[in-house]
Every structure is written in structure tokens, then in C-alpha cells.
């Protein structure tokens, strides 16, 4: 694509169409943009547009498109072509910093993100001058530019907060500190001076406080891994100024908005985080500054209002106290009874109250409320912070804290009892306080795993929770109902089974509540209860115990999907999946009705897939429906195909990328259930599955390979007879997969199925080429994974076609190659093979080579006979060799960049491990003994003499054991 006006005009038109809400306009535009993004100059055209277009919407759209392009394509993946040409890479890096700094803020943010994505790959080795270029801009005095630099630095360095320690990381941070720490400190001091100079200029202060917030975030990132010497030497400068900013109260920066945090709150929040970091990790060095920070933060907490805009500040301030009170160093600051009472009264209880803003979120923004309350993304909420502070205080003062809080709980419950209609929020706070007081350790899987023994959870459940669960009006006091459900959910491991069984039918009735939060919690609680393990590794709650409620449970779950706000509720769909899995054959009578509802839902969500978890559980539920029903009656598979194929066809025709991996897995499951030949409906689809475009997407590869394996297993002969022209396409897929380090094992899965299931004559003409491709890959890139797969394939070939055929095909490629493969690959590497089936294939294949290949007895290959036998006995008896060569780096298959749908394995579409040898060989050791006996009978004296001269004593002893077990001997 040339950098010319015509191309800029075309790109502008398609970007505009890509914003169109009408999918018939938008989708083709997106497809066009996708099709041209591989062209050289495409990213430069986008940069030109975002710099020069007269239309601001197009500029922003170009910036977002550019950032997403970089996200998808910048990383260079081994075995794959470079998606951004080298000239484009050079031009982008040469211009992007300047462009970012001269752009308006909306565009600046997108380009800043793009720089950090590029930096993640290229900095520092391939972009050594990035930091220097950025630091020099600090001298510009223009805070629009300075803030652009700070924002970019923040997005570049914030990964230091969660990266694992490594020498590479240390050297990068050291380079950053050497270049950046001093200019950042100078900028910090200069900005604070400017704040004093412009103390009455609100516009100047807004810009300066934005800078201070970014500087404080950078301080956090650069200090997270370890305390750098530079910051230790300059601690006085940083901490004195942080303390000054924490106590600053500039009326000009106060906002009228009750929701949105202002600049002052954001800055103080970050400073609280910075102080907490030092208090936790560098307490010795921080000790001189700690008392004044504790005082400042305490004063901040008792003087800050309940408005939402202060939530982040208050939660970070409380988190600071929580991190301090957990450290033995600072225990003395909290041990006084009056201090504990004061903390409880002035900090914890006020911040556990259910405010009108929380009530609004509960009613009007339920998705966000659930995300925060259930999924632990409440990290910056007041309640979560107050809860953490309670836990922190209980570490050293469990008795006194429990006593103080119990008094508050009792008084709150007494207030509620006086007038439940008016005072229900008191009970809500009491439940939350009990929960935070009782919870010592919690996991997503088991709920509370360790509880405060001073709190009687069962008694509280009976006296205060059960009444809300039993209430006939599920729509009355929805917050308290949600609290009660959550109590059951998080204390499920502490409550006795009879209480949980009592709760189950009550939870089922709450699935019909109008409140989204309430019916979502009910679904989630049921799903969690159904996953609890009982004494014999079975489920705690059994299908028999669920029998009286099965119909109502299924009805209410599916009805709740029709409630406003829950059409794609992932918790409900997960509960449906778990219910199917728990009840098994008990759901069969209901499946004919439910499958219609599930397929209808699938059709709806496929129009615009937006809830990945919901979609995943939906497909899992479909798989369970198929497996459970067809287990009892395999013939019913056709009724599922009738229900599902029309929807699947639409998904395939519309290329709904997110759903293709799922569709292929469900189709595999259906096809694998067929007992005889392959149905014609599947054969019609077969050619389409070989289209190269499908194989370009990483997420499609594992499920497509499995589907092709199912085709080969059920219809190898049919393919050979009626679709022989498609065999080259099938082998083309194998060739593509085998060339990739990430996917070569998938190529072998496919190849093994071809060898096992295709009629031998149908692939005779291709066999030699297959081996040549494998040798080329061995020469260019020999990895442990490849060798293990290669060994399994070679031995499967020996099992399927015989040892003579194996020897002949090797030697037809190059004379004496069979010996080279035995000596260089099979003998030294076979011990690396893992997996029972894989080991069995190798054992049977090698046994055939040892006993059914005349060349092993009468040619120069004879010298390899005993080492090969020794290697086979090693495969049987020695531990698996799991060493990996020093020079082989780990290939991270999962971490594929960009917007490709990652492969989502469906747990309930699980494929049984296939044993191509099956019952033909029960015990490979016995087979070896019998085969050696047969060989020795054919050439008496040879085998014992070969064994006695060169097999080591230990291996010989093992072999004697095999012969005895098989009741045979060598002659």
C-alpha cells in the first residue's frame, strides 16, 4: 500500500464504516481492514491519518485501530512470518514518541499504550534510545508534553509490579533507574515548587496535580521489586513531600461531583499506596517516617466524608493501616484498648455501612456490584478495606477485637429488630461485620477455609440468616436476602451438611427473585454447593438428595435467564452446567425440552458474542446434554444433530470466530458417538475443514485436529473412497502443523490417525514424502517435544505396517538411514516418552523391530539389536527421562498475542484417551518375551549368545522375569 491520498481516502471510508452500528455495514469494513493490515505501510497510513485528518472522529478511530494493530502484530512469534515489515517498524519507532507528545490527549493515550506494547517487546535491546528521548522532554517546561511522557513511562513500567524476579528484569530496572530516577526526582521537586507558585491558579494546579499523581505512580512501580539505592538515598526528599501532599487541603481542587474522585483524592490515594508499600516491604528504612504517616492517614480517615468520590482514597488509607498493623514491628501502635475501640468506631464501622450509593449500584448497576462483591474486584472498596483491617487487627488482637465488634453486632441487630422496614441497613452491616470477623482465610474454591473460633457461625446462621432465606416473599429486602445467600456461600465449608441441605430448596426459590443480585447469588451459591466434596471423594450433595427438587431447580434456573438483566448471566449458566453434571441421568427426561431452550439461546448470543464466560458454560451444558443422554442411548445422537446443526451452520457461515473452536469440539463429541460409518451431513462439511484460513487462527487448531481425527476414525475408508482428492489437503494441514514448534504435536496427532485409520493403499504414494518432511524438521529444529512425538509415530508405523516396512521406507530415503535413526534417536531418546499409551506403542513397535525385521539379525544393523533391547527394557523399568537440553528454550504456547480467540477447552467435551493397540496387547513385557521366544525358535542359539555378550546384568535380570511371567524360554 503506497502512502498516497487515494489510500488515505479509502482507509478513511472504511474506518468510518467500521464505526457503523449496522452489522451489515460494519462487518464487511472490519473484514476489509483485517485483509489489508498485512500490507507494508498500513500502520504508517494510520499514523498519517491520526496526525492529519480533518475529522476528529477519524483521528481517534485511526489511533485506536493503530493501537489494536500493534497489540495484535508487533510481537514476533517463532515459526510465524513477521507481521510488521522491518521498514514499518523502524519508521514507527522513529516517529511515534514525537507524534504522541504533539497529539491531543484522547489520541495521546492510545499512542502511549502503543508505545508501551512496543516497549514491552523491544525495550531496551531494540529500542535503546526510547528513555533518553522521553527524559529530554522533561526540560521542555510544557506540561502537556511532560504528562505525555509520564503517562507513557507509567504504562511501560507498571509491569514491574507483577513481573517475577529475574536477572533480565533487574538489569532492565537498573537501566531505567540510571536514566530516569534522577530526572524524575528533579521533576517531582520542581512540580511541587510550581504548585506553590501557582497556588491560586486552578487551571495550572489541575495540570500540575495530574503530573504529581503520575510521578507517584512511577515511584510505586520503580520501588516495587526492591528498594533502589537511589530512592533510599533520596527518601527524605520523597517522604517529606509525600507527607506534605497528604496533609494538603487546597479548596480550589475540591470538586462538587459526589461520584468522580478529584485530582487531590487521586494523588493522596496513590501516596497511601506508596506508604503502604514501604511499610510492608522496607519497614526498617521507613521506620523514621512511619509515625507521621500513621497520624496523617488517621486524620485523613476521620475527616473524610462518605461520598463515593472518596472511596479509593479511604480504601487505600485503610489498607495502609491494615498493612501496618500486621507487622510485628508496629504492633505497639495498636495494642491499647482505647486505640482498638477508636479504630472500630471511627474507621471500621462507618466504612461497612451500606450507603445510598451502594443501594443504587445494587439496583441499577447489578453487574458491577456482583463483580466487586463476588469476584474480589472490590479491592478498592471501603468495605473490602475495612474487612482487611479487621483481619489484620485479629492477627495480634483477636480476643479484644472480637469482643469489641460483638458489642457492635448486637447493638446493630437490636436496632434492626426495633423496626426492620426502616433499619434493615443495620442488619446488613452486622452480617458484613460478622463475615469479616470470622473469615481468617478464604479461597474461591472452598469459601472460608479458616474461621475465627470465637464466632459461632452455625448459631448466627440459625438465629439471623435462616429467617431471610425462609421468607415467602423473595422480593422483600433483597439486600438482606443477598447477604443471607452470600453467608451460606462463603461459610459452606463451616456449616454442617444438614444446614446446607435445608438451604438448597430455599436457594432454588430465590432464583425467581426480581433482583438481579439476589437471583445471581442464588445461582452462584447452588453451583458452589454442588461442587463440594463429600467423604468418599464424591459430591457432598448427592443426586438422590436432589431428587425432590430436580424439576423445580431446572425450571427456575431456565426461567431466571428470562428475568430482566440476566439474559446472558454467566452465574446462572454455570449453575445449569453444574446441575447437569451433578444430576447426570436424572436430567434425561427434561433434555428434549431444555435442548431447544439452549440452542435458541445459542442462536441469539451468536449474533453478537459479548459474554465469553456465559458462552463457555452454554457450550459445556450442550456437551453434558449430549454425553448424558447418549450414554444411556447412543441412537439419540441424531436428535441432537437435528437440533444443533442449523445453528452450527449459521455460526460457520457467518464466521463467528469466538464460537468456532466450541462448535468443532461439540461436533467431535457427536461424531465420536456414532458407532459405524460417517453420516453424509458430516462428509458435506469435510472439504471446508481443510481451508487454510481456518488453520490460521491458533484457537481453531486443537479442536479442528480432534474433529479431523474423529472423521478419520469413523470414516477413513469413506474418505479414501469418496474424497480421495482431499487427502493432499489433509496432508497439507499436517505439513503446516509440523513446521510449527507450538503446534507440531497436533500435526502428529493427525498423522497418527491417518496411519491408523486410512486404508494403507490410499496413502502409499504419500508415505515417503511424510518421512522426508519429518526429517527436514528434525534437522532444522529438534526439540524434546518433537522427538517424543516422532518416536510414537515411528513405532505406530511399525505396529501398523510392520517392522520390515519401517526399515525399508527409511532406507529408501537414504541408504543405512534406518540404522542412523535407531542409533541417534530411538535408542538414546526413547526413555523420554511419557504416557501409558505412548509407552505401550513404543514398546510394541520396538518389539516388532527386534523380532520381525530380518535386517536386525543379518546386516550391519545387528550391532544395534542389543542396545535397542536394552533401551526397551529401560523404557519399561527406568524412571522417565524428563531432562530438557540446555539450549532448548521453553515455548509458551498459551501466550499468543493479539486478538485471536485462544483455544477454550470444553471440560465436558472431553475425549477419551485412545489406545490404537487396544486389547491386542495386554502386557507389552509379555509380548516381548513371547516374541523373543518365537525369534529364538526360528534361529536357535543366536538370541542367548547376543544377550550374554552385550546386555548388562540388570537388564538381563529384568528380561528373565518377563520370560518367567510368560512361561517361555529362549533356545
From Swiss-Prot:
Main location: cytoplasm
Coiled coil: none
Annotated Pfam families: CAS_CSE1 (PF03378), Cse1 (PF08506), IBN_N (PF03810)
GO molecular function: nuclear export signal receptor activity; small GTPase binding
Record-linked PROSITE patterns: IMPORTIN_B_NT
GO BP terms: protein export from nucleus; protein import into nucleus
Superkingdom of origin: Eukaryota
InterPro entries in UniProt: ARM-like, ARM-type_fold, Importin-beta_N, XPO2_C, XPO2_central
Residues covered by the Importin N-terminal domain: 29-102
Subunit structure: Interacts with cftr.
Protein name, UniProt field: Exportin-2
Record lineage: Eukaryota, Metazoa, Chordata, Craniata, Vertebrata
